[in-house]
UniProtKB/Swiss-Prot annotation:
Functional description taken from the UniProt entry: Poly-ADP-ribosyltransferase involved in various processes such as Wnt signaling pathway, telomere length and vesicle trafficking. Acts as an activator of the Wnt signaling pathway by mediating poly-ADP-ribosylation of AXIN1 and AXIN2, 2 key components of the beta-catenin destruction complex: poly-ADP-ribosylated target proteins are recognized by RNF146, which mediates their ubiquitination and subsequent degradation. Also mediates poly-ADP-ribosylation of BLZF1 and CASC3, followed by recruitment of RNF146 and subsequent ubiquitination.
Amino-acid positions noted as binding Zn(2+) in the UniProt annotation, renumbered to this chain: C1081, H1084, C1089, C1092
Compartment(s): Cytoplasm; Golgi apparatus membrane; Nucleus; Chromosome, Telomere
Gene that encodes it: Tnks2
Gene3D superfamilies membership: 3.90.228.10, 6.20.320.10, Ankyrin repeat-containing domain (1.25.40.20), Transcription Factor, Ets-1 (1.10.150.50)
InterPro entries with a match to the protein in the record: Ankyrin_rpt, Ankyrin_rpt-contain_sf, Poly(ADP-ribose)pol_cat_dom, SAM, SAM/pointed_sf
Subunit structure: Oligomerizes and associates with TNKS. Interacts with the cytoplasmic domain of LNPEP/Otase in SLC2A4/GLUT4-vesicles. Binds to the N-terminus of Grb14 and TRF1 with its ankyrin repeat region. Interacts with HIF1AN. Interacts with RNF146; this interaction leads to ubiquitination and proteasomal degradation. Interacts with NUMA1.
Descriptive protein name: Poly [ADP-ribose] polymerase tankyrase-2
Catalysed reactions, semicolon-separated: NAD(+) + (ADP-D-ribosyl)n-acceptor = nicotinamide + (ADP-D-ribosyl)n+1-acceptor + H(+); L-aspartyl-[protein] + NAD(+) = 4-O-(ADP-D-ribosyl)-L-aspartyl-[protein] + nicotinamide; L-glutamyl-[protein] + NAD(+) = 5-O-(ADP-D-ribosyl)-L-glutamyl-[protein] + nicotinamide
Amino acid sequence: MSGRRCAGGGAACASAGAEAVEPSARELFEACRNGDVERVKRLVTPEKVNSRDTAGRKSTPLHFAAGFGRKDVVEYLLQNGANVQARDDGGLIPLHNACSFGHAEVVNLLLQHGADPNARDNWNYTPLHEAAIKGKIDVCIVLLQHGAEPTIRNTDGRTALDLADPSAKAVLTGDYKKDELLESARSGNEEKMMALLTPLNVNCHASDGRKSTPLHLAAGYNRVKIVQLLLHHGADVHAKDKGDLVPLHNACSYGHYEVTELLVKHGACVNAMDLWQFTPLHEAASKNRIEVCSLLLSYGADPTLLNCHNKSAIDLAPTAQLKERLSYEFKGHSLLQAAREADVTRIKKHLSLEMVNFKHPQTHETALHCAAASPYPKRKQICELLLRKGANTNEKTKEFLTPLHVASENAHNDVVEVVVKHEAKVNALDSLGQTSLHRAAHCGHLQTCRLLLSYGCDPNIISLQGFTALQMGNENVQQLLQEGASLGHSEADRQLLEAAKAGDVETVKKLCTVQSVNCRDIEGRQSTPLHFAAGYNRVSVVEYLLQHGADVHAKDKGGLVPLHNACSYGHYEVAELLVKHGAVVNVADLWKFTPLHEAAAKGKYEICKLLLQHGADPTKKNRDGNTPLDLVKDGDTDIQDLLRGDAALLDAAKKGCLARVKKLSSPDNVNCRDTQGRHSTPLHLAAGYNNLEVAEYLLQHGADVNAQDKGGLIPLHNAASYGHVDVAALLIKYNACVNATDKWAFTPLHEAAQKGRTQLCALLLAHGADPTLKNQEGQTPLDLVSADDVSALLTAAMPPSALPTCYKPQVLSGVRGPGATADALSSGPSSPSSLSAASSLDNLSGSFSELSAVVSSSAAEGATGLQRKEDSGIDFSITQFIRNLGLEHLMDIFEREQITLDVLVEMGHKELKEIGINAYGHRHKLIKGVERLISGQQGLNPYLTLNNSGSGTILIDLSPDDKEFQSVEEEMQSTVREHRDGGHAGGVFNRYNILKIQKVCNKKLWERYTHRRKEVSEENHNHANERMLFHGSPFVNAIIHKGFDERHAYIGGMFGAGIYFAENSSKSNQYVYGIGGGTGCPIHKDRSCYICHRQLLFCRVTLGKSFLQFSAMKMAHSPPGHHSVTGRPSVNGLALAEYVIYRGEQAYPEYLITYQIVRPEGMVDG
């Protein structure tokens, strides 16, 4: 082996005895070894390019260049005739040398120029042996990729793997970078995969997981290109993973149609079963992969096979439609297969009226096509049986082949006779523009040609390639067809053509026969009578010719059909007739002009419209690459819009061009999509670009107000994002979902809040938008706010937090008189006589300072919900206060002296000592506890005490026995009315269940209200015109904290951007969840919910001088000289009065009423 090892490095050993070589040859060898391309170019001649180193190993220049890795020199030598298979003394070819020294690029170059990857030297060493021995991993991979055989043994019986360096063994076992290979197949990294792929690892299995092969992963992840490459390089379509799944299972489970098709075309078994006996069809059907199911069935998948649970694919189909489709297509494919095999028994088993015209989903073949092509003797019987059952004689495949085409091509003359007798069109054209005669002539079927000619097949029809049947046949066929052609053109034919051109119906009727109806103008353009009649607008002639067998698909020598002629000259009636008789609207002439190209170029608007209505494709290009739109003249804007179709409507909606929208829109396209962009509808664009009139027109004509684009946005999202208040209001009017979410769970309120759209936020909230909804990031609209006013608005709309509450103070007998509370709540001089509530409500405007003092003495008690001890003789709150300080032993002193909490607030060390509290520590504890109680903190414990500073809101619970409670309840119940909307907004009810009535105490709001009341009174002759009115709003929580805020009012209200009140509680009840009832209660989304609690405000409202109004009028402020607007009932106007103020401080929320509406007796659900 020592001699052979020297041979392996032949290039290195070649210098020995070089002096014996002629100088020019020696110089060439040296230049090749050193990589001196310029010298090589000077020295190489055709005679010297394969010269030998006679003093050494008989190496050629290519041996030297390859061994030393001189790629440029190798490339030049190969281009100039170097022999890639030349052997030196040891039998080595240049490839051996390049592989031995690891020159991968040179190896690749030599292999591309035909070097044998399995060439053997004198010791049977291959290039792979050389690379493996030296551990040249890259070279091993290149050799294996080019067909190197790893099992070849040298003269010692050793393979490349036996001799391989440890670093190269993994390549030869298929384990080299296996994980990277599998990952590249999964991720679709072609370059990475091809750098690692060899025949030894193409079917490697993952070491963990499901033991998948690269093909399993590529199929499951829909890597179409990777699948193609793997299959090309020998991937096993039958390879199974740990669960016995084949790659086809993966592709079908995920619905990857192209991958499935590739696998079945490469022999994948469509009925392969995994360990649980699931077939690929089980996988596809259970996941509702409809198209994949159809594909599998067309390749023989059986939907009746049962898995281990005794379930078939049909059983696993999730929808009735898919179950039905699986059964139907299985029967259909069974019928097609029986027809191919001409099996009468099976045909009868599967044949029915429903199945007789079943089409193969991919090829569009019918059973009649299959029978016509069948080589079996009973095909004629099968065809007759199918035709008796109603098979369509002229049905076409995907390539436009009729059964007559198929039978003619196969010389099945018996079938030709049968289908012609059943009215087969003998001149029907396939996708190449060929008749049955073309196909028979091309195949040299002389008898078939003769038979077709006898049935009137036209030998002069020119195919799309410009050939007649005569030109496609052999000598015998040509002779036969020449005779038929000369017989076919007579004087009568010429007269018929002239009559059709002139519109002479009588002459046409006289001359027209079955043989002559499709005669040709031989001397001219090969036109038929129908071509002439269509081009010259001879409507009656066209009608007659079509009724008597004229071929609507006949082409002249330019490839024009009659429809081209009619469209080019704008003959609408003729074009309509031709289309009704089956003319193909997308047929193309030799220059690939369709009828639509003709009509568009000539400015024929109505013709274009007709063609488009019947499926003409406006994207088809002629030979110059022009679509019909490209050929329209600049002035024909109507045709341009027509051809642009949906794109034109979308553009018009975007630009706000109402006239164009009206012209272009129809029920079919009003919800069309921007397929090149975000899949927006016209309404999305109109809403986003603030085109109010366009939006309104689209909504009136069927636009889907809640249509989602690609990102899940509805038009309201767009309007909200860009702050288009009027458009948003219009969308809401047409029932846009105010809480609709996009793919990232953003609502319109998120959009408006993020962009600082205050008015839009107010509008959305007023119509039931939920401010608590979170997007995928967990953010509410409030979290996205940047503007302070929007932040305030959203904060106000958030669900009510726990407010401090207390029961209305009630002093026990012997402490205060029974009228103490009423006195504290009564007004100074007198109550306004205009208040509409019961008389006890007329005394509610008393001194707020007195009220606060009373509240402070009972707040802590009310906050805990504990009941007062009726027999204690003292306010329970002082008892709780003393107990929390740990001074219970002092209770006797407080009871004896009748010290209540409000009295204690005024006492100091001196007063406490006088009543008998002598210990300084006790007095200090009491005084500090009181200080904390009034310092603004909240809680039972004096060290975390109730806010009584006057800056916040306190709710006083009224007892049901209290006259105040009863008066408010009476006002609520007595003002319920039946509304025109039948309860749509506020629910169906006739009374309430009053759960709670709370008095709202807020010193700041009260002072603001009284100040404004005084101003109004002074401006209105000392008459404030104060009323007690109801107000419904989703902002109740904000109102009782901050008062009414006119900044958030919506201008779209009946009387503009004001704050609305009603004297009827049922009227205000319509607004508790938003305008028009919003979206109903938060939990059930029901406007007539009888379970959820509602809240209504009974407010003190200063109307001052009110402006009477009977019809809608948009106002941002009250009319000059007035303080409010009163909407009076009128015919076709309001049914119940409404009161509107335009300044928030003109109303004070006096009572918060919590209630339920009650279902009327006898009312049935739904």
